[in-house]
Amino acid sequence: MILLMLFGYVSSFVNWAFCTVVTPILAMQLSKQIKGLHFPMMIAAGYSTMILGQCLGPSASVFALVATEGHFLQDKIGILTQDQTVYNGVNVTLFTIIAIFTVILSILTVPPQDEVVEFKKEFDDDVEEEIELENTIADKLNGSKIIMYLIGIAGAIVIILTFVEKGILGSLSVNFIIFLFMTINCFLYNSPRKFVDAYKENMVLTTEVVIQFPFYGGLMGMITNSGFGAVIVQAIVNVATTTSMPVWAYISASLTNLFIPSQGGQWIVQGPLLVEAAQQLNANIIHIIDAFVYGDEATNLLQPLYVIPALSVVGMKLKDVWGFMAFIWVFWLILTTLGFYFIPMIV
């Protein structure tokens, strides 16, 4: 369990979608080799690492967005680099506490041996299908390693120059992270054809997510245009203080995420309102942003949208893991609210 969760945290720092898929695969392989592991808890614990890892990872939408020049709130909060928003003392301390507690909780939450559900489903290895290329210039280019390497080298040069100019943390904007992964893929796939085929294969895992997003987009529009988001934030301002504002930002983000499970889309709705509330109360805007991210991520344990690809990989259903996910969320709620209230007083 410890190995699985450490792997989950590290892979989440790389990219949340990457972690969502590879962590259940590792859980599956570990369960094949080690008897007596409760597989539903392995999946729930691994998924929780993806969620929590985003609170200290460079690929979280809001952290990357507010570090991007020209973002829509720049005139109010400026550009906040990730060494300010992600790697500050309060955030690192809170993340460490929750991460350690989650590992301990996952280890201790083991059912009696007669109730353990082991992984049983066998997966056949996919046989790689050889594609016969036609003897044309276009098909030769589609199967060419040189094309991918040339694009990859050009991308690597741009990445290095950006790091030199802005520093590593200062470079981590939304556009840069997308560009970084595209460049890495140029070296991982040795032909354009294999890259496109891999992309098409993995799109199968996202089908249910893609179908649901238009509906959540509609909910986002209703919340925005109806003024419901403004009502929530105004209610917070009425009861919050400078010290408790991060806690209320966390709670409001958690509630809104149940209806808008998209961190970037949710920030578009709540960001301006939370910034305005923070300025009215003279609260620390960085702590507000951190609390928003924690709140958005926490209820992903209750909102099942992003666990669907993971369940598809291992052939499980939501009912098999949701109880464990909700159990972890309860403890996160307690730790995070206490953390955002007391840790800023100490660190």
Task: Annotate the PLM regions.
Residues 9-16, 20, 24, 50, ...:
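Transmembrane alpha-helical segments of multi-pass membrane transport proteins and ion-pumping complexes
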Residues 1-11, 36-59, 76-83, 243-257, ...:
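Alpha-helical transmembrane segments of multi-pass membrane proteins
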Residues 26-116, 306-339:
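Membrane-core helix-loop-helix motifs of multi-pass transport proteins
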Residues 1-26, 211-226, 237-276, 280-281, ...:
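Hydrophobic alpha-helical transmembrane segments of multi-pass integral membrane proteins
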Residues 1-32, 165-186:
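Alpha-helical transmembrane segments and their immediate interhelical/interface regions
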Residues 28-35, 197-208, 234-238, 275-279, ...:
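Short amphipathic alpha-helical coupling elements at transmembrane boundaries
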Residues 87-100, 104-208, 212, 327-330, ...:
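Hydrophobic transmembrane alpha-helices of multi-pass small-molecule transporters
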